[in-house]
């Protein structure tokens, strides 16, 4: 939390990567605290879609996280393209289809896939 507070204080935009990864999993309340400090929460298909690296996955955990944090503070990415995974483009297609299938609205997918990353990289200003 101290780093997120400092980032907010000095105007740095930040993202929290892999909060659902078992190695460094955060509680939803911790993610909400970071969100409230202006941090974007990264959600990736790896914890949602079974793979050789993670043979058991709970897609609803990712969906719950997006709904609880709010799409306006989430970023989505495939995190695929590694050895033994599908390539990044196919991974993203599968991830988006899964999100839509589990009830995430198309407009919210656009926000998380296009709008929020642009904001994070200061590409949203003219």
What are these model-derived regions, one by one?
Residues 1-7, 25-34, 51-64, 81-97, ...:
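Histidine/acidic-residue-rich catalytic or RNA/ligand-binding cores of hydrolases
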Residues 15-23:
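Catalytic beta/alpha-barrel core
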